[in-house]
């Protein structure tokens, strides 16, 4: 875990050095099987605490598809597939996002990109930060 933490810190320092960040959302990791991810979650939050970020929030994983599932029960693999489909549809429908389509389509971890995108979109919309419809 120390190696992961050091690498993460280096990547954050390089990627974010010229960006002012005043808000960070981190998907809350739950359950005993997610112990490693829970540790990384803590490292991410600690990094931004040390950088003086004003708002750091943990948000539930279930949020990202709430606006699309309408309380329908789904299995893990169904949610992964749906998040990819929903993200692709949004990218195709929003002209200002078209340039992201090739990156998304070619990426080997589409499910992770989709989850992050939808989680961010949910947060922006439900915190009235901009009109994200």
Predicted regions and their residues:
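Phosphate- and other anionic-substrate recognition elements at nucleic-acid/protein interfaces
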Residues: 1-133
């Amino acid at each position: 875990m120390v190696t992961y933490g050091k690498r993460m810190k280096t990547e954050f320092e390089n990627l974010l050095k010229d960006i002012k960040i005043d808000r960070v959302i981190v998907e809350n990791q739950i359950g005993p099987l997610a112990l490693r991810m829970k540790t990384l979650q803590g490292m991410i939050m600690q990094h931004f605490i040390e950088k003086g970020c004003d708002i750091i929030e943990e948000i539930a994983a279930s949020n990202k598809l709430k606006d699309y599932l309408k309380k329908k029960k789904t299995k893990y693999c169904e949610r992964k597939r749906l998040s990819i489909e929903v993200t692709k549809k949004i990218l195709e429908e929003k002209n200002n996002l078209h340039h992201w389509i090739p990156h998304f389509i070619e990426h080997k971890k589409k499910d992770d990109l989709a989850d992050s995108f939808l989680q961010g979109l949910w947060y922006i919309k439900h915190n009235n930060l901009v009109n994200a419809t």
